[in-house]
């Protein structure tokens, strides 16, 4: 079986594994208070062009989302996001479990707009009973979205402007950040993205690390006591240097971006191959996730040979599935899949 099911099926990039082995018997303080984590934080700041940012290392995406969101919000507030947002549909109520409601808005190809933020906040504050309603306290988006789509620089600028107008911190979930930034459809640099939000994270788990996400806080108002929030949510890894080693390696010599670009290039080959066979694609993803709309017979053509993700029913006779590439996708596996698509 060849896996195109997700972007976390393999372990980690060989350079990371080598560094973990090299530093295995090094003795360091715990809880990310070691020299390696200090160097990794400095490397992240340099890459992001954020010399004054606070950088924290957490283990996984849901943990990062829950920690950041609950740290930002007051008890009576909720997080605005798309109705397809990860915190709304794929985190098993993790945000709600902290006492905060996820306030969803209709998505457009996975994204939300500045106008939706304006409308939601206007409606809330114009309601005479607004004190009886969960107050919007922040905005959550992901880059790329759950649909593999991207916000343009203009869209993100407009969203951040709206957030500033309504005094809402903007949090960008970057679980697949590298794949988004390396898409040919992306008109943003990581420096620009960092300047257009209050907090974001650089995903490692899906982008070459064994595990780990690097939370970057640029808004001074959100920095205070964040490590308390990490500990409270079970995210303070005793052997924190394992996270530092990984992110220091990913940030060196552009490794993070190089391995993500290869995954995107492969994914676009998959998209092109399906389109050449007349297969309709669901959405306009130009990142490492591709969503062909297949008949049951076409799905069976791949079953037993390729693992893919079932995404949902499209109509009475067609289904949306996801083929996902990663930093570790091999050329021979790509060749096999492209051949299978051609023979479909």
Where are these regions (language model features)?
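Conserved N-terminal alpha-helix of the aminotransferase class I/II PLP-enzyme fold
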Residues: 13-61, 83-88, 94
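Active-site C-terminal subdomain of aminotransferase-like
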Residues: 135-136, 142-145, 150, 187-287
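Catalytic PLP-binding core of fold-type I/II PLP enzymes
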Residues: 151-183
């Amino acid at each position: 079986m060849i896996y195109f099911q997700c972007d976390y099926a393999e372990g980690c990039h060989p350079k990371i594994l080598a560094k973990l082995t090299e530093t295995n018997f090094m003795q360091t303080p715990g809880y990310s208070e070691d020299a390696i984590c200090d160097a990794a934080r400095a490397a992240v700041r340099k890459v992001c062009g954020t010399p004054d940012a606070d950088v924290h290392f957490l283990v996984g995406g849901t943990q990062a989302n829950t920690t950041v969101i609950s740290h930002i919000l007051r008890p009576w507030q909720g997080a605005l996001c798309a109705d397809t947002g990860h915190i709304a549909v794929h985190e098993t109520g993790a945000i709600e479990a902290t006492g905060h409601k996820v306030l969803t808005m209709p998505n457009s190809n996975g994204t939300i707009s500045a106008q939706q933020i304006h409308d939601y906040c206007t409606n809330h504050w114009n309601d005479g009973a607004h004190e009886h309603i969960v107050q919007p306290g922040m905005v959550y988006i992901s880059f790329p979205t759950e649909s593999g789509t991207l916000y343009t620089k203009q869209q993100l600028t407009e969203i951040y402007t709206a957030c500033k107008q309504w005094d809402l911190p903007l949090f960008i979930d970057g679980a697949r950040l590298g794949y988004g930034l390396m898409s040919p459809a992306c008109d943003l640099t990581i420096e620009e993205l960092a300047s257009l939000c209050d907090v974001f994270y650089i995903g490692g788990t899906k982008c070459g690390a064994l595990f780990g996400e690097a939370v970057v806080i640029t808004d001074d108002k959100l920095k205070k006591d964040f490590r308390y929030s990490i500990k409270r949510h079970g995210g303070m890894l005793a052997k924190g240097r394992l996270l530092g080693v990984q992110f220091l390696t990913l940030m060196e010599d552009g490794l993070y971006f190089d391995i993500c670009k290869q995954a995107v290039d492969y994914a676009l080959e998959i998209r092109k191959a399906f389109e050449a066979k007349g297969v309709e694609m669901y959405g306009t993803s130009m990142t490492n996730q591709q969503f062909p709309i297949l008949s049951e017979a076409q799905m069976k053509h791949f079953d037993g040979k390729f693992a893919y993700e079932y995404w949902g029913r499209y109509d009475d006779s067609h289904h949306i599935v996801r083929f996902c590439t990663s930093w570790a996708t091999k050329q021979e596996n790509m060749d096999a899949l492209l051949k299978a698509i051609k023979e479909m």
